[in-house]
Each structure stands twice: as structure tokens, then as C-alpha cells.
Amino acid sequence: VALPKVALLSAVETVTARITSTLDAAALCKMAQRGQITGAILDGPLAFDNAISAEAARIKGITSEVSGDADILVLPDLESGNVAAKLLEYLAGAASCGVVLGARVPIALTSRADGAASRVASPPRAAAVPPPTLEAAPSAQVRPRTRFRP
């Protein structure tokens, strides 16, 4: 896929301050709109149903290049990602390859119950992920966290 369609998932498809993942998705979409994130078409927040079903998106009135045709699903956190991966594997027969993004380097992540194919495929897949690039103003760069000391 030359330009993958990325669905930034949340429980709902509208931005609300009460659900952090909707704010995160909106911020990522804004960054993509400004050219700070390139190489993909991002949209979100999207609920799972309208990320994978054009009919669900149509019923909910969502018009998007991504809805119903997502190539990549980005889950809001590790817990929901783990649950989604296991649901897809056990109920839909999906093959898995575990990679955690967001750290300084990609992390290969396998389950104790994973078969040999997943265990063999995950490390090279993690190694193939390019390092993160974020074109931000100097004032917006991430600084190392310091511990709070009372």
C-alpha cells in the first residue's frame, strides 16, 4: 500500500474532552494536516465499526477517506490493543506480529501463547519500523522527564 489509510480508534467518533483517546486522535490528525506526520492518510477518532465498515460509517454519517477502508488500526492504549489482537487471532484466525510503538525504539512483543511463526516474525518486523520523526518547533520538542521531589 503506497499511502496507507490509518484509523485512529476510540470508543466514539466525536472529539470529547472526557475521552483522552479522542483528543489524541484529533491532535494526530491536525499534525498530519500540517505536514508534521507524513506517509499516510490519518483519520480519527473513529470507532472500530466505522473504521472497518463503510456501511456503519454511512449509517453514522461519517464521510472519510479512511472509514470503511482502513489499512492500519491504531488502538488508544496497550490494553485495548492487546484485547483487539487476541480477538482477531482467536475469533477471526488472524496471524499476529507484535510491535509496540511509541518508545524510543520499536519493541517486539509476543504473547506466551503465541506460536513459532509469531515469535519468529515479530523481532524483524519491529526492527523494520523506521525511527519516529517529528518536525516540531524547538519549544515543542520532548524533553526528558524529571522526577518530582517534594
Predicted feature descriptions by range:
Residues 22-29, 88-93, 123-128:
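Short, solvent-exposed amphipathic alpha-helical segments in soluble enzyme
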Residues 8-9, 74, 122:
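Buried hydrophobic positions in well-ordered alpha/beta secondary-structure cores of metabolic enzymes
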Residues 45-47, 100-115:
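Short, flexible loop segments at boundaries between secondary-structure elements
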Residues 1-12, 26, 106:
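Internal alpha/beta core interface subdomains
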Residues 11-17, 21-71:
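Active-site rim loops that border cofactor/substrate pockets in soluble metabolic enzymes
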